[in-house]
Regions:
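Hot-dog-fold acyl-thioester-processing enzymes
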Residues: 2-61, 117-142
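Conserved GNAT-family N-acetyltransferase fold
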Residues: 34, 96, 110
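Hydrophobic beta-strand-centered segment that forms part of the acyl-chain substrate-binding groove
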Residues: 41-92, 107-110
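Compact nucleic-acid interaction/catalytic patches
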Residues: 92-98
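Solvent-exposed strand-loop boundary residues in beta-sheet-rich modules
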Residues: 102-104, 120
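Beta-sandwich strand segments
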Residues: 105-106, 124
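Short beta-strand edge segments in extracellular beta-sheet folds
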Residues: 113-115
Length: 142
């Protein structure tokens, strides 16, 4: 069992636009779904991408590992579990899994490393103090 610092669930319904000709979710869409869940995780904790961009900052994915275990299908209602597994002053490692709530089976899981960059210099940036306070004091909403 993985130990996580903070976590959040994101509900997801699968539509025809998400699937291939077989009715299975197209593999690239799992990254999109995980991105939505991470963005929702941040938004629910008062961390807004618009505010970061106004300060010439942005989160970028540095690394993504995905394991596709079972196919998600058209009209499935699923849960994406997002958790911060590890954090430092300039990066976070998220563990994410897509779960079928009916049977508890994991369909896909991923480890996503996210860094903060300065949009002017295009170089890694240490998290600003307000973000560090949220991350370090465990103030994320669970």
């Amino acid at each position: 069992m993985r130990k996580h610092i903070q976590h959040r669930d994101f509900l997801l319904d699968i539509y025809i636009e998400d699937t291939d000709f077989q009715g299975f979710v197209y593999h690239a869409n799992y990254l999109k779904f995980f991105e939505r869940a991470r963005s929702n995780f941040l938004l629910e904790n008062g961390i807004f991408h618009k505010d970061l961009v106004q300060n010439s900052l942005a989160f970028v994915v540095k690394r993504a590992e995905m394991d596709f275990l079972l196919p998600a299908k058209l009209e499935d209602s699923l849960v994406i579990k997002t958790a911060i597994e590890k954090k430092s002053k300039a990066r976070m490692i998220f563990y994410q899994s897509m779960v079928n709530p009916e049977d508890g089976k994991i369909l896909c899981r991923g480890v996503i490393e996210v860094c903060l960059i300065n949009l002017v210099t295009k170089k890694p940036q240490i998290f600003p103090n307000d973000l560090l306070l949220i991350f370090n004091k465990g103030e994320l909403n669970e």
